[in-house]
Each structure stands twice: as C-alpha cells, then as structure tokens.
Amino acid sequence: GKYGTGLLFLPKESKLQDVILSILIEEIEKEGLTLMHLRKVPVNSSILGTDALSTEPDIRQIFVTGCNDQALLEKKLYLIRKRVEKKIRQTNAEIRQDFYIVSLSTRSIIYKGMLSSMQLRHYFPDLTNSYFTSGLALVHSRFSTNTFPTWSLAQPFRLLAHNGEINTVRGNRGWM
C-alpha cells in the first residue's frame, strides 16, 4: 500500500515515550517519510491477570506515509525499525526494558501480548471492529516453557510463529 503501520510497546512514563518517539520520528524523516498519525491502541486491561497487568506496556499504533512504491516502503520501514532498535539498545535500561516494535510493515499488523488466545479479542477491541478486515489471521496460543513470559516475547513474532521446536521435514514426516 501507500502507507505502513506498526504497533509499538512503550513504557508507561510519558518522558520515556517522548525519548523513543523522537528517535522514531528522526529515523522516519531520514528515510524521507512522514509520521502521519500516532494512535493509542484501545485495550481492555480489566481482563489481564496480575503478572500481565503489572508489566502491561502502553501500546501505540503508527502510520507512516511518503512512498508510493510498496516494496521500497517495506524496505524503508525495515531499516527504520532496525535503526530505532539499535539506538534504543544504546539508551538507558529503563527505556529499553519496556520498548518493543511489535510490527512495522505495509503488509501485516501484529496484535499480541501476555494473553491467552481467548483473551486476545477481548483485550484488543480493534479485533472485533467491523471496519477492520483481513485476508488472513494467525493465532498462536502456546506459552513459553523455557523463558520467563514477557509482552515482547509473546507469539507471534514478526515473521514466524512456532513453539520453539523447529524440527526437520524428515522428522515430521516420520511422525505422520
């Protein structure tokens, strides 16, 4: 499309958000693009468990425009994400801890969190809004077994959803 969109996990503190957003805007402008809109994603925090609620990030959605070539825009968004992540890694731990770019793309939007698959649509009202349509939806509901659960480590990842056990084709055929 002619725009890209992304979901961001941000710290709750507005001063920390301002630092992150200034880095993000700087990188967007370096690519000759424009941050068209910044939206607070509506959520229903009342359904969260204690651990998820205590670590819940502020979730924002961005819309980026300025390039009519979808493939080129996708590449620019990838570069922006990588540079922003690198700059944030070089900041203080307080900013790094609660920051994560969930998705930034012309092709997909990822909604995720420390939620069960049944909680997902109740937590994100966007997912039950009739104005939002999708040709494909992927839901991954397995919890991590070898890492401490966090919002950023929730499945799916940007390009992959799996249970941590990527086996060989031959091995999978043997089990069929």
Go through each PLM region and give its residues.
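N-terminal segments that mediate ammonia production and transfer
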Residues: 1-176
